Amino acid sequence: MIKIALCAAILAIAYAEEGTVYLFDPTGKSGVSGNVRFLQLPNGINVVGEIRGLPPGKHGFHIHQEGNISPSCLAAGGHFNPKKKLHGGPDDSVDHRHIGDLGNIEADENGIAFFNFIDSIISFKGETNIIGRSVVVHEKEDDLGKGGHPDSLQTGNAGGRLACGVIGVKTIC
């Protein structure tokens, strides 16, 4: 009984402290895969990851509305946008971006993207809670809503979806 109570207490703490996601292509076509951790810090969420199998260059990286990634990441829906704002970049204010707009990650010549940044808008609670939502890596660079393309203010004109996964809670029990 003590072990159950201890695990419940740890789960409550972990829920507020760390999320994790394994990214992959559910269709198996792109070969893209990787891991991303979301760590609560005093000034926001630290997003740390490694993704392999990408074409070299920049790729849009977003949190999407739904936690459903079947059959080909399309069920993830649009960018996480509870405030109903236009698309923007991670440096834009909450009034000028979707909550899920995390900008771009960049793959090197070997197709590997390492990244480590802090986002002050996403969270593990309330209206901006990312737990149970999906992360999507896109085929093209996100123009951060400034590209002038008809899709710029909705998707950043980042193209198709190469890999996705659902953000879960990391626990030690």
Enumerate the predicted regions with their spans:
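N-terminal leader/targeting pre-sequences
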Residues: 2-173
